[in-house]
Amino acid sequence: RIRLGGRIRSLRCYLRPMRHLKEIYGQRLLEKELYLHTSPETGVWVDTVLGNWIEGSTLHETVAQAAALRDRESLQILVRLFDRLALALVTDDRAHGDLKPENIIVGDDGTLCPIDFDASYLPAFAGEISPELGTAAYQHPARTAADFDERIDDYPAALISTALHALAEDPTLWDRYGSSDGLLYTPQRIASDPAYRETLALFEKRGMAVQYRIAQLLTAPTLRLFGLAELLAEAVRGDIGEAGCPRR
């Protein structure tokens, strides 16, 4: 967080080379912009990315607080906002690459804004390998570096949506399964995960057919979750307005 030209901005520094920063961030990338001292006598010039500062908390922090307070109304608002964001992501020809609640800011104005696009996929990167695999707590367990296309956000989008819908129905799930590393579920053992099983039972009991079908996709053997976009569209149908935030 810095002040520049009378405005509060964000400044991200890169201590090691990163692929495709120019393609991802465009003119926001300032190459060899900052000199960092590594010792009293030596230092290194590093690349930086200048962006808009977004006042707010991460989605993970906001969800944890709302669940602890049993604030179902706030959780219901968050899940509606997230489903619209998820639909936009999974129908785009780009992908975030490391979609997780810690990389989404809930702005003070009530918008959801993704941050940290370093692992993004753009159409120009077709055929390349992924520079990183994202955070394991939200990624399909079968994801490898070879999986690098516009669909790599499918699994984390479905997982986060499922967890938010479950918490909006029963915030006490956070007491039993909430985690600083994830939300409720462990992808590596999703089929036997007690939180996942409890979620399916909850959705079935409440007649939440769309959410039940999205949750079922989390056991798919592939990263591409066929039908996810249509299910998310059905979930947000009739919802008015947009969860807008500054473009990347």
Named regions from a protein language model:
Residues N103-I115:
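Conserved protein kinase catalytic/activation segment
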Residues R1-L30:
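ATP-binding glycine-rich loop module of kinase domains
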Residues G26-S74:
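Conserved structural core of kinase catalytic domains
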Residues A86-E102, V106:
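Catalytic-loop of the protein kinase fold
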Residues E128-A142:
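Conserved activation segment of eukaryotic-like protein kinases, specifically the C-terminal portion
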Residues D116-Y121:
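Activation of the activation-loop gatekeeper triad in protein kinase-fold domains
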Residues A166-R247:
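Helical subdomain adjoining the active site within ATP-dependent kinase catalytic cores
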Residues E73-L85:
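Conserved alphaE helix
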